[in-house]
Amino acid sequence: MSDAPVDVVTRADGSLVLQPHGAIGPDDAVALRQVLVHAVRHVRPLRLILDLHDVSELDPINLGTLAAACGLGDDHHVAVFVDGSSIRIADQLTAAGVPQQRLRQITEPSPALSAPSPR
């Protein structure tokens, strides 16, 4: 995420969409947490959608941050959803405490990426 910032888009229906990119590691934890807290506490959109379609990796700190964002959203009456994650990241988010009903549009890995390489 350090190389590419989080894109923020406001939809006509009142949803705020956050789109991080690439591998999100420990160096990105503070920035991601600040964006999420600002969105939930100050912007207070109808819905906060974390679009992870372009995220290849989430470290444990940021997995916990996304799980905590769901609880923070509940406290502030903001529905938080996670869209477009890979199956692997969706499983990690579920293990970190993100309720299954918050995960939408889970994507299959590309066949080229999941196929064993020829020898």
Place the predicted regions along the sequence by residue.
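STAS-like cytosolic regulatory interaction modules
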Residues: M1-E57, I61, A67-R119
